[in-house]
Design a protein with these regions (language model features):
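Short acidic-hydrophobic, aromatic-tinged amphipathic segments that line or gate anion-handling sites
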Residues: 52, 72-74, 169-171, 223-228
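Helix N-cap/beta->alpha junction signal
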Residues: 4, 54-55, 75, 174, ...
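C-terminal amphipathic helix plus adjacent low-complexity
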Residues: 240-284
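Donor-nucleotide binding loops and adjacent catalytic segments primarily
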Residues: 88-184
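A nucleotide-sugar donor-handling region in carbohydrate enzymes
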Residues: 46-122, 274
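A donor-sugar binding/catalytic signature common to diverse glycosyltransferases
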Residues: 1-2, 9-12, 25, 50, ...
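Active-site and donor-binding regions of nucleotide-sugar-utilizing enzymes
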Residues: 1-67
């Protein structure tokens, strides 16, 4: 199971009741501004094998009572995708998604802030104001996810697109086009995890808005700001002074190889005999 989406809870519950062991990727992370946090931790407790993306997250899973011999720091699949997926050239991606030639651009993704009920609309409005004011950039905006409030976010962004000539809203770019777009972008803007994991590995600065990703390990190229137009604009200007230098906080790009090796070792035994016990850390 990957990550923290609501829909995986049902699959995990079914597997648990059928005594089918679960392997969980990207556990141990914190996103205090989203309900994903609770889902992720719940899946961790239902899982037998754990494949976190950093050493900090590995230790956190152990802190939750999972035995160290079942927890492996393997890095993030997002970094592996960057190192293995053949990218489009800048000219190709600009032509493909109709970004004006010669104009610097940003890739924007803004998801609902599910732990701050009633605040999503105002945060989207502030983002739109910032894009309107920082008109030296073209904004390639991908639609919000399926979280509660996602449709409203997309409606507000569609409304903004009718007004802003320097913005294009797309449903989805797919992995190859998305990573290619981020690679050549001046910066990434919004509150998506891709600004925390993939963008730094590509060397692209990120303006991370609000608390949705609060708690994640962040590279020096990630600039956090309040969800206010003035703060967003100041952070955008700050990216202009930052070098585009890759940062690999989330592994070396060999995640899948490591996972396959570990799974092969575990499946030498009959999984029906696997037992989970609570790993009790020494209390002081």
């Amino acid at each position: 199971m990957l990550g923290d989406r609501t829909e995986i809870l049902g699959m995990c519950a079914a597997a648990l009741n059928e005594h089918i062991p679960i392997a969980h990727l990207h556990g141990g992370e914190l996103t205090e501004g989203a309900v994903d946090d609770c889902i992720r931790h719940a899946v961790t407790k239902m899982s037998y094998l754990h494949f976190p993306a950093t050493e900090v997250y590995r230790r956190r899973i152990i802190q939750m009572g999972e035995a160290p011999e079942r927890v492996y720091n393997v890095g993030a699949l997002g970094v592996e995708n960057i190192l293995s997926v053949p990218m489009l050239s800048e000219e190709e991606i600009r032509k493909d998604v109709e970004i004006p030639a010669g104009m610097p651009y940003a890739v924007v993704t803004f998801h609902p802030v599910t732990m701050q009920p009633g605040e999503t609309e105002q945060q989207v409005r502030e983002l739109i104001v910032a894009m309107r004011e920082e008109k030296q950039y073209f904004y390639l905006v991908t639609k919000a996810n399926a979280d509660a409030g996602g449709r409203q976010v997309n409606a507000w962004l569609a409304e903004a697109q009718r007004e802003l000539t320097n913005m294009k809203l797309v449903s989805s770019l797919g992995m190859k086009r998305y990573l290619s777009a981020v690679k050549y972008a001046a910066f990434v803007l919004g509150n998506s995890s891709s600004g925390i994991i993939e963008a730094p590995a590509l060397g692209t600065p990120t303006v991370n808005i609000g608390d949705r990703q609060k708690g994640r390990l962040m590279a020096e190229t990630v600039i956090g700001c309040m969800p206010e137009a003035g703060a967003i604009q100041a952070a955008i200007r700050q990216t202009e002074q930052m070098p585009h230098r890759p940062s690999f906080l989330y592994g070396d790009g060999k995640t899948s190889q490591k996972i396959v090796k570990i799974l092969k070792e575990f499946f030498h035994t009959d999984y029906r005999h696997w037992k989970k016990t609570f790993y009790d850390m020494e209390c002081k």
